[in-house]
Regions:
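Active-site cofactor/cluster-binding pocket
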Residues: 1-4, 8, 13, 78-88, ...
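C-terminal non-catalytic interaction/assembly regions of soluble proteins
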Residues: 1-34, 38, 46
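Internal, active-site/partner-interface "lid" segment
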Residues: 21-23, 28, 49-67, 236-254, ...
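Active-site phosphate/pyrophosphate-binding segments
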Residues: 30, 36-109, 117, 121-122
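Secondary-structure capping and boundary motifs in well-ordered enzyme cores
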Residues: 217, 221, 350, 357-360
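Short cysteine clusters
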Residues: 271, 353, 358-364, 368
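Short, charged low-complexity linear segments at domain edges
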Residues: 325-352
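Iron-sulfur cluster-binding cysteine motifs and their immediate structural context
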Residues: 337-339, 363-374
Length: 374
């Protein structure tokens, strides 16, 4: 509508020699980062720019999309960008909201936070985008390159999520896992290894999973990981951050008892030193995947849909899909039975049936929506 208004206004004024182009953005609720905006301005420099265009998507059907190149960093100097990949319900989002409040209340820095959730909500993927800086932050878009990226669930590494691609050269990548180096070397994909080695990424691991169980916090390891973040990101002096975190924990949990408060204080103290730096091998720069790609079986049209659409979307890489991937699904209908291919493996531990303790009440069979015990 704005394009039509401008063209009409110029035509009514008799100024027909002015070149006007217009485009659409935010299609399908897509993010609009600086590289998309830069693509629009670059199109204007061409002798014959497209009158109508789209940005933010790869439109290989109508060919109206513009080529997007990596844009220069436009944030003010000194702005620190952090990105956290969590699991819905694990406390990552709550901890990051707490971090933003601590930094905003106790420093002179400007703060900004965006949070992404997938459709599964609890148990689904969450991505937290935090920015801190000494100057006002005018970045109404998600973080594309971060100084600090944290993976709070090891299954994302196994599945091949492209998290490390978000780290700036020389930045920090922290993985929450129970693995030693050999296991980490086995699970990391070759493209992630190459990026880490070639861009001098500072790689850290932290076993907040076992540490939380040891302290008595169960699955709630967000406090440990939050403490590790403040220690590694250097957004503010570590001692101050730890004290502010303890004050916040006391305020939040005192009504639940002093034991809960002490437990959180212990988690904060331990988390600040629980991480380990990984010495990145030089041969990672030329790493190649030796494991063959998993072969999917089933109806050809279903397998095609799983490979072309379901798998990239499951890895939070759906924004990279071209329009042509959906040509066979223009009416919104998709093949049935795709859930059989979606094995997310997000659980750190799985239950086993102990026949010596089972009284055969059958409650587990009818409570479980998948009746896995059967």
């Amino acid at each position: 509508p704005l394009y039509m208004d401008v063209v009409t206004a110029l035509a009514n004024a008799g100024k027909n020699d002015i070149k006007v182009i217009g485009g659409r953005y935010g299609l399908g609720s897509k993010d609009t980062p600086p590289r998309s905006v830069f693509a629009g301005f670059e199109e204007l420099t061409k002798a014959e720019p497209k009158r109508q265009f789209t940005i933010g998507i790869v439109d290989d059907v109508t060919n109206l999309s513009l080529e997007e190149k990596p844009a220069p960093l436009v944030a003010p100097a000194g702005t620190i960008a952090c990105k956290f990949w969590g699991l819905g319900g694990d406390g990552t989002v709550g901890a990051n909201k707490n971090s933003i409040k601590i930094i905003g209340d106790h420093t002179d820095k400007y703060v900004q936070a965006y949070f992404q959730y997938d459709s599964k909500k609890t148990g689904g993927v969450t991505i937290s985008h935090l920015r801190f800086g000494d100057k006002p932050i005018k970045s109404p878009y998600y973080i594309n390159k971060a100084d600090f990226v944290a993976c709070h669930n090891p299954s994302y590494i196994i599945k091949g999520f492209k998290m490390v691609d978000d780290v700036k050269p020389g930045g920090v990548f922290m993985i929450n896992c129970q693995w030693d180096f050999d296991e980490l070397n086995h699970h990391l994909k070759a493209d992630a290894k190459r990026y880490i080695a070639r861009n001098n990424i500072q790689l850290y691991t932290i076993n907040a999973i076992d540490l939380a169980i040891e302290i008595g916090m169960g699955k709630r390891n967000n406090t440990i990981l939050q403490s590790a973040f403040f220690s590694l990101a250097k957004v503010m002096p570590e001692e101050q951050a730890i004290q502010y975190m303890k004050d916040a924990a006391t305020h939040s949990y005192l009504k639940k008892g002093q034991d809960i408060v002490d437990m959180n204080h212990k988690a904060i103290d331990l988390g600040a030193t629980a991480y380990k730096k990984i010495d990145v091998p030089a041969d990672w720069a030329n790493a190649v995947d030796t494991k063959p790609a998993k072969e999917l079986k089933g109806k050809p049209e279903l397998v095609k849909m799983v490979k072309d659409i379901l798998e990239p979307v499951g890895k939070m890489d759906g924004d990279s899909l071209p329009v042509s991937a959906f040509v066979d699904h223009v009416d919104g209908q998709f093949e049935l039975g795709a859930s059989a291919y979606e094995k997310r493996g997000v659980a750190v531990s799985v239950p086993t049936w102990d026949s010596t303790k089972c009284i055969q009440c059958n409650q587990c069979a009818y409570v479980c929506p998948h009746a896995t015990i059967r």
